[in-house]
Design a protein with these regions (language model features):
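Structured interaction patches on ligand/partner-binding surfaces of diverse proteins
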Residues: 2-4, 169-194
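Structural motif
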Residues: 116-128
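Short strand-edge motifs at loop-to-beta-strand transitions and within beta-strands
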Residues: 72-79, 150-152, 186-188
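A glycine-anchored, Pro-Gly-centered beta-turn/N-cap motif
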Residues: 85, 158-160
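Short, acidic Ser/Thr/Gly-rich low-complexity loop/linker segments typical of extracellular
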Residues: 136-151
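Extracellular/lumenal mature domains of secreted and surface-exposed proteins
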Residues: 1-112
Length: 194
């Protein structure tokens, strides 16, 4: 008998993209609360859109590539967090036919910072009730007083640079600190010159 030739067409499925980029553990700088994600999402037919949900309830960062071959590799997404707390970052990559892949990073905990020190007389004895003023720019964010041992502690501060000064009637404390926070800063001590 005769043989018949049949043609067979093989179709391959179009797999969804793979969302990727900066290693999850390296996205957020815990000292500055600044997050930076460099995209490295891939797909055989191209990645048309990448979106980043920063986990803080704010706007989602999103970029769309409208030109073939559709690649957003190297695109930089950034966010500066405004408040302490736990954040879960989710990066979503979309291919040219709308298929999506989500990469969810483990929670990142943003903690506030503190500064501390003591106030002493010229003879090195502690001074109680010294007024310590902490400013960020021109705004006073905290005023505290030293305890009986001359010590003070200021907590719950966000990243930034703080101006720290000390005053008490009858004493002169010449030290002025312009202290970056993130991490915390102990040892901001004041010694009277009289």
């Amino acid at each position: 008998e005769g043989s018949k030739a049949k043609s067979i067409r093989v179709f391959t499925s179009d797999a969804p993209p793979v969302a990727g980029g900066t290693d999850c553990a390296s996205i957020v700088d815990l000292n500055t609360w600044v997050a930076t994600l460099v995209d490295n999402s891939l797909d055989v037919n191209g990645v048309k859109q990448v979106a980043v949900n920063w986990g803080d309830g704010g706007a989602i960062s999103s970029v769309i590539d409208t030109t073939a071959p559709y690649s957003l590799v190297g695109t930089v997404f950034t966010r500066t967090y405004l408040n302490a707390g736990s954040r879960v970052i989710k990066q979503t990559a979309y291919d040219t036919i709308g298929q999506a892949n989500v990469r969810t990073c483990p929670p990142v905990v943003l903690s506030t910072f503190g500064l501390s020190g003591n106030a002493r007389r010229l003879d090195n004895t502690p001074v109680a009730s010294v007024k310590v003023v902490v400013k960020k720019g021109a705004v006073t964010v905290r005023t505290v007083y030293t305890n009986a041992l001359g010590d003070y502690v200021v907590g719950n501060l966000k990243p930034g640079t703080y101006n720290v000064t000390a005053t008490k009637a009858g004493l002169i404390f010449p030290q002025v600190y312009n202290q970056p926070l993130g991490p915390s800063a102990p040892g901001l001590n004041f010694q009277a010159t009289n």
